[in-house]
Amino acid sequence: MKTLQSTLLLFLFVPLIKPAPPSQQDSRIIYDYGTDNLEETFFSQDYEDKYLDGKSTKEKETMIIVPDEKSFQLQKDETITPLPPKKENDEMPTCLLCVCLSGSVYCEEVDIDAVPPLPKESAYLYARFNKIKKLTAKDFADIPNLRRLDFTGNLIEDIEDGTFSKLSLLEELTLAENQLLKLPVLPPKLTLFNAKYNKIKSRGIKANTFKKLHNLSFLYLDHNALESVPLNLPESLRVIHLQFNNITSITDDTFCKANDTSYIRDRIEEIRLEGNPVILGKHPNSFICLKRLPIGSYI
């Protein structure tokens, strides 16, 4: 009877007992009030409190998701795909590497080893003192308005056939200080051609190389390995520099016309032949058509 009364009193006071807040509860405690039913009730309540207040949160904080092979492959493909391999000509845009100003492109001393892609409106290219070894037809295929090219101080030893064939407006071509052994076919409207300080020999210049260049005024072929003066030099020439080659002789037809004693070549202002083995004094008839004698050795 006393036991029954005690049990009833406990049931009456249980609703008045409030559990501590979740932050103050010890989730490991199981309240035991001396009866199996009460123990089970409080154990269930504690379990629910743990599940609702802490378990889900803790699981979110510590959950580690291990993707299967398929999802990992998708993630790899979409988020960490490696960059494609760099192409041979995949370089920095020309106008970032060089300076582009109103149709002029300045690529001087930037260590390029090939002609960079040029803006289509380019008229002047200065690519001096680089490491360019070869010029090809595709370098200028889509740049028809070029008027001046300057490749001074490169390593050019080969110029592909047809490289300048589409440059009908080109007026000045400078290939000084390179490694050339021969000359390419030159565009017809050239007024200046400069190929000094190369390794050009006479056999590297075809007989008709200069013949049709009716606008050519300035020709610089000094400091090469020429054994003779190039043939068929155009009447338009004003300045001819051939000093410091290996020229050993000249003829009456080199600058004049042996069969026409009245012929005067009045446009030529300067011919330089010093530094060659030839003795100009031995060929007096070679200069009778000139207003000024060539510079060189006469004795």
Curated annotation (Swiss-Prot):
The keyword Oxidoreductase does not apply. Bone and cornea. The keyword Transit peptide does not apply. PROSITE patterns: LRR. Pfam families: LRR_8. GO terms for molecular function: growth factor activity. Residues 1-19 form the signal peptide. Induces bone formation in conjunction with TGF-beta-1 or TGF-beta-2. This is Mimecan. It comes from Bos taurus. The gene is OGN.
